[in-house]
């Protein structure tokens, strides 16, 4: 499958088989992640691969979002000692997000299912991981990628909508709006 087909095929998989993923495949996902671009080649990322069911369950109990039955998870973190400083200090979020997208695409190309669950900037979501994963304060968990063999199939798609595309400059137009999620507006 070519890259465009892989992008359309990539979907958030929420149901996984109990079958474990070989360590070599998990390392291939990390190698794909580190092929992502970073601002000034800073590479501020750290990856924690978790295959221990007890640890996965504890993380699922403590984090706010996503509680999936995948046999593996990759916690993608930004290391502030490696991140840029000054007005571009938050570029680590973009860098690590690009790495996560590479993991998702690589997983799809390998017939694995995956889903990205965001942690940062919701402190109540990422803070519990510090103790569980022995993280130093300068390492911030950005997100979790659950990975496994899919137990569900979803049709390939794109969410392209020409109402969100502009040529040369932004124009005021009527857009679809999203209902406010009161869960996060407290």
Model region roles, listed by residue range:
Residues 1-186:
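Acidic, surface-exposed loops and disordered segments
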